[in-house]
Structures are given as C-alpha cells and as structure tokens.
C-alpha cells in the first residue's frame, strides 16, 4: 500500500512518520507531476486551509486531486484537510474540494490559547488522545456520513 501525503504546507511530516511506523509506504505530493504516481490513499494534513487551497491552485494540483477524490480515492483529513473536503464552511467562503457532505466552522475552538487536550472514544478503536488547536468544528453532517467520535461539551 502506498499513501500520498499532501506536502505543500502544514503538518505533513507528522502524518508521514505515523504511516511509516505502521509500515506504509508514503509519497509526498509537492507539485502537479507528483500526482502522476500511483497511490492507494491520500492524507490532507492540518495547516492553514486558505494557504493550502491557494497553493494547490497555483501548483495546478487542485483539479486533479479533486477528480481523484470524486473517483473514490480514500482520504484521511485532519484540521485544514477537513475544511478542504467540506461542502460548506459556515464562517468563511468555500475554497476547497467540497466533496464531503459536512458543514464546518473554521477555528471554532478559538485562539491558540483556547487549545485543549481530550481523551475520547473512537468507534472501532477505543479511547484515544486528541489535540484541538484552533480546530474546525463539524456543525452538521449529511445522511451518509458516519460519526466515529464526538467531543463532549
């Protein structure tokens, strides 16, 4: 199995290291030519969604990636990656792929000082530590979206 990690901005190295510890081959996507490689999944990392979207368009990567996602490429998205996938962003203009039927709110947990740690259950996995650093909040999900974890208010 080979997983591509979007590596134009954000926390891509952390995702690569985690996948490599699991024995998964990774490839970095930095330019349009990198999309010509074969890969079985995609990671859209945390970072700054506005910057990532702009860079993907400037590097001519946006449309080819969107097409792969629409064709069914499995995607793991964290933070900014989730914002890129969301069909709706309630407190900002939509700049992403709009392929996941969710509505998110950017920076919903406030400023950097409002960051927090939470241990919660993930369906099929168990208790897992989670960090929320200016993270997006999922306000609503489409009928076909399965919720795997929720943070208690």
Please provide the spans of the model-predicted regions.
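N-terminal beta1-alpha1 cap of cysteine-dependent amidohydrolase-like domains
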Residues: 1-58, 63-68
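Short low-complexity stretches enriched in small and charged residues
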Residues: 1-9, 32-36, 54-55, 84-91, ...
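Cysteine-nucleophile active-site neighborhood
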Residues: 49-120
